[in-house]
């Protein structure tokens, strides 16, 4: 696409929450090497692109290894996650400012341009500093010959704010609403369409809010251990109790590692807590002695279920197909304060080829492997890593696991089918297909069982769907199924 040479202008940048302020030390002098926060953000973006790394795992490790703390750590974090969230929008603007197609650029150059575009369009970093530090970074990672090109492209980006760029680079919302929203909120078009379908009739008024909420910076949410100290006894200063889970609280800031190390709490989104609570409180017929977490790694829900099972006098069996993830579950349960909790067994096994007899369990939690499109606030790269063509294989695995979960549950017992995706192909379509082909299975009213949480009914009203824009949680889907024979 030919370069768009607009006159230099001023104006506000993208609306919403601003990035961190920065001092004059961010105003890099020409010729200086790449500064540590920007180099670290670049290294994470490159690893996400080239090695399928996860930013939420790699960034904390690099910050610790490089001794980056305080304001510099905040800058590296903002640049990493902000660039990943806004990548689709920034690419549209960069394409209008470049005389070379973006897919013909060397990957290091493209990543530097994206970092620069994020600073120019969505943070308070001064334009001259954003351009100068990006040129320094380009020299460091791609050599001196690209510096002129990077400088020219980013100077063109800086001629307008994001609100002024959008009408130039996005489709007309009057004729292509989904295309406009895809560029405006930085999503692949197919995810915009999938969210529209998942919201059903509510999409007319809520789709834009749902997409915007997927770009929010989430606060850290934790769960106290049932049977251990009450959350009010362990909440640090500034923390707030969650609205609906009696175990959850959100941190005002800081590192949750100290609380995690004590075993009294673990990081867990409130929607994930509600999924475990839904299984534990769903009515069953007969005994209530043995619970199964069928895809338990890395252990967040298993830990909460362990405490809930202990309070009910039940035993938990936690399973994951991968031994290293089963080891994470063992570690999570071993750190929990035992208090009233019952015992637990953790095994590595494939839920599709179970190591237990049919009908062995009273309650079964199945948190299936999924696209992760309900957790984009925490893992923004998932939107660029997944494609619509991935869904049929995922749905096939999900159906197989759900059939196995129903077989593991005794008559009168309950299965919770949970995904961190709102996409119909992974949620209501999977459940309705499996239930229709599995005699002796009925669908319970999940929203009624989660009655403390408002506005969770999905377009299929017997299923519960939480949303970031409604509940400030991940977009978790919950279906509750009972075996009748």
Language-model regions: role of each:
Residues 1-485:
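S-adenosylmethionine
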